[in-house]
Amino acid sequence: MYLINQNGWIEVICGSMFSGKSEELIRRVRRTQFAKQHAIVFKPCIDNRYSEEDVVSHNGLKVKAVPVSASKDIFEHITEELDVIAIDEVQFFDGDIVEVVQVLANRGYRVIVAGLDQDFRGLPFGQVPQLMAIAEHVTKLQAVCSVCGSPASRTQRLIDGEPAAFDDPIILVGASESYEPRCRHCHAVPANKDK
C-alpha cells in the first residue's frame, strides 16, 4: 500500500470463493489492532454459515462482527473513536451499501470491504463493481481451480454434484458442499433444463 496522509479511504478485497477474501479482511483488521487503532467489523445477517457473530474464514480464522440486516443499520454502530470499519460479504448487502461506504470514507474512516465480484454465473455481483470503481485500493484474489489447478477467478455452484443452471437463484449461502473455485475454462453454467 501507498503512504496515505489523509484520513478516509475505501479498500475492496474481492475474488472467487475460497480465494482468501475473509482471511485478508481479518488480517487487515488484526494489523490495525497492533497499531492501537479501533476497528469494527460488520457482516450481513444472511451469512450465518460458521457463526452468527463472527467473520470466519474457510481456514478457521475469525474476528468478532456485528450482524446487520440493512446497510444503513451500520450507522447505528459508528462512534468517533473508530478508525477502521470493515464489512465482509458485501455482495449480500442492499443497494445502499455504496452510499454508506462513501459517507464513512468521506467522514475520515478507513473502510475495508470484502466480497464476491462475480456471481456463480460469472456476472458482476451486487454492488461490488460499483465499490471497486470508487475505491482507492482494490485487491483481487484468486483461488486454485478445483478441476485443473489453474488460477481460479470464478465460483462454481454445484447442485447434487452438477453445475447449477443459469437461471437458478443468485443468492444461496453455502460453503464447500455447494461451491468450488474454477478457472474461466472449467467454469460451467448450463441453460435451465426445464425450458
Swiss-Prot record:
The keyword Magnesium does not apply. It is found in: Cytoplasm. ATP binds at G15, S16, M17, F18, S19, G20, K21, S22, D88, E89, V90, Q91. The active site is at E89. It catalyses: thymidine + ATP = dTMP + ADP + H(+). Its EC number is 2.7.1.21. The keyword ATP-binding applies. One of its GO terms (molecular function) is ATP binding. Substrate binds at F120, I170, I171, L172, V173, G174, Y179. GO terms for cellular component: cytosol. InterPro entries: P-loop_NTPase, Thymidine_kinase, Thymidine_kinase_CS. GO terms for biological process: DNA biosynthetic process; thymidine metabolic process. Its main location: cytoplasm. Zn(2+) binds at C145, C148, C183, C186. Keywords: ATP-binding, Cytoplasm, DNA synthesis, Kinase, Metal-binding, Nucleotide-binding, Transferase, Zinc. PANTHER family: THYMIDINE KINASE, THYMIDINE KINASE, CYTOSOLIC. Homotetramer. Belongs to the thymidine kinase family. HAMAP family: Thymidine_kinase. This is Thymidine kinase. The lineage of its organism: Bacteria, Bacillati, Bacillota, Bacilli, Bacillales.
